[in-house]
Every structure is written in structure tokens, then in C-alpha cells.
Amino acid sequence: MADEKTLTFPVEATHIMMFRRSIGDFAVPDTGLEKAAAPPTFPRAVAQFDPDYHLRIRPGVPWFGSGKNASGVEGKPTSSGGLHAEQHYEFIRPVMPGDVLTVTEKVGKTWEKESKRAGKLIFTERVSEYRDQKGELVCIGRGVGVRTERPVDQK
């Protein structure tokens, strides 16, 4: 992802309902959808509005897949790939149906640690600010990814 990216994310009651169902949250009856706040991890659903989201399958484009043998990876990998290590959200107010969020994602902190089996572990933080249709801050999300300098030794 580029250093900074901005996306628009319309929050709909049915989108919140489907998200709740997908995580096994049935606390809100379907009849109360229009007044129900989104669950805490819902802001990450902005990925559905990102045309360049790296996990999206695209017709005719090899995908790295999730099986034992990734379908879109050819040859010997140069690293172990990436790992989603952490996700944190700080809410100023709940995300509600009817909100239109503008999300600005940017690179946060980066740091390294040494690993015996994979060389350097490179940590990268992504910071996402979610602002509503009035420009007011609703939520700040921080995610940390880790990649390795080389594939992990299998010994």
C-alpha cells in the first residue's frame, strides 16, 4: 500500500447486520438494525470498499490462496510472507448506520527484531483515521504486520 490512502465507506445497517452474523454476534435483533452501533472490529470492513485490497480475488490474476500450496506463488518464496500481528481500535464515538466514513490510512511506526530462524523480523504499523460526514473523528485503528527477512528455517 502507498504511504497514504483515502477511502469513503458508507455504513449501512444491513452491512453491520451481516458483519455481526459473520462473527457470531446475534445480540441485536434484525428489527433493531437502524439504531444498532457497529461491533468494535467493524471499521476494518473498509477493505470491502478498497479496489486495491491485497486479499481480494481478481478474475484472471493468480492469487496466493490459503491452502498448503498457494496457487499464485511460483518458485521458491523469498520470505515467509506477512503476518497480521495486532489490531487496536480507539473509539471517540460508536460507528452507526447512516455514517459515511472517510478513512485515511498511513504508515505508522516501523521497527525490527532479530530472529534465530528467519533473520530480521520487520514490524510495520498502519494507522487508520475514520472521520464522519461532518469531518469529525470517530475512530482510530492501528494494525501491525510482521514480515521476515528470509523464509523460516524448518530445522
Where are these regions (language model features)?
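Hot-dog-fold acyl-thioester-processing enzymes
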Residues: 1-86, 152-155
